[in-house]
Amino acid sequence: MHVLHEPSAISFDKVGIRGKIFPSRELSNKAGFVLINTQAGHETTIIEHESDFIYYVLEGSGFFEVNDKKEECSAGDLVVIPAGSKFTYKGKLKMLLVNTPPWREEQEETL
């Protein structure tokens, strides 16, 4: 099936964010898709070593800090974070995250 419905269960709840991971690996091994909800933001700063992260802000507002540069974001904005970047984000946000290649826990470094 090519239509993936929003997962009903939370896939993870950590460091200030809750996420629902779409089961897309059987359709594509080149990208992963995650629905992110946060009330206050990411509690840590990370470096994602292998995947580009592309966030589309569906609701809310806040800011991303990427490589020590802070930029505000709100609904309708697209935030592109290249692999190897140091980043965090804050705010009450609902976002669709596309990561390419798909995210794996071992490729992420928490600072």
Please give the residue ranges for each predicted region.
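Residues at the C-termini of beta-strands that transition into short coil/loop
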Residues: 7, 37, 99
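A short, N-terminal "cap"/entry segment at the start of jelly-roll beta-barrel domains
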Residues: 1-32, 45, 110-111
